[in-house]
């Protein structure tokens, strides 16, 4: 194996896919065949060098776009390759997109927190009296919880306001009802942005090599990786579990977690504070309900729906049949970011959930923009990327079915058998300099 990876698409299920990997020394699927056709464009020799600059094509570009004409059009005449420099993307975005409006942010927070209070305080007692309402109440309240998560998500990035204290307060208020420790999650999430689609440094959904999959606890594989119910159980497991064999990034509730091994010392203290707010809210949910059965109806059911939303949205943003990941020697920030996908969920979902679904490419490149600026920023980024064939946007109005189908087909597998452009060659495309 070369140590280079991209997400594998296979018709087999997740465990069966890795069974093939064990027997052949690599994981393969239909997309691998398409990528082999693209290798003529990449034209990377076994030595890792290419015969001419025009033949170098960074492997992050998805297979349907991997043709010489795309590479030639993008690089010809202007001295620029198909992959723009980060500065070019940032300069294309109106400056006001990077300026949070605290009053506007507070307005959205008040609306979403008010809706959540209404769901828990007004609607949930009615569910106890009329259990037939549960199939409506659980997904509705879970969606409102997801809306609050996006508000806290802005706080974690510092894009809610320029006031760090206000960001921390609103972040904890919006995250505690979701049992998400605000500061630890903000820390790990920043690593996810910093190293998006890096095979070993990315945080969130694990990128699974055959070796890592085999080293993962079988119970964790059963509960979180291999089956449809992982969409409901994966996120709480990710936050809770500490042991390396769980394939998480470390517990977000435990101040001694390996998550903070390279973090500033105060992150462990902040972890204790954030975890305490979650435990406190969880205690309130038990105190406010009459029995375990009522608690399951009033809180657990919508919580699991929220967990599904978080899994589904983040999974679909970063996984598709042609998604690529990168090992240490070939990863580059813009290349990793270009694997992000803007997905239109439709039915008012994109608007209700603050465009976290359909404006995610711009957000992943520049996380310091508040959610209400993302539409304008997306239009600007799209204007740079789309003419070069680098912008990924999918109509995903079948998002429920798509989540389960894609997870079954793609899982978290990676493939390691295709020649790649080297980091130097990739940088040459970005800067417009020859790699010869």
PLM regions with names:
Residues 158, 173-177, 364-365, 384:
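Alpha-helix C-capping/helix-to-loop hinge sites
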Residues 145-164, 185-199, 313-321, 357-368:
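Acidic (Asp/Glu-rich) catalytic motifs at the cytosolic membrane interface
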Residues 351-384:
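C-terminal, well-structured subdomains that either form a transmembrane helix-short loop-helix hairpin
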Residues 160-179, 202-221, 327-346:
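Juxtamembrane helix-capping/reentrant segments at transmembrane boundaries
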Residues 307, 311-352, 391-396:
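Membrane-interfacial segments at transmembrane helix termini in multi-pass membrane proteins
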Residues 1-18:
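PEST-like, low-complexity acidic/proline-rich intrinsically disordered segments
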Residues 14-144, 151, 175-301, 308, ...:
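Non-catalytic, topology-defining segments of multipass membrane proteins
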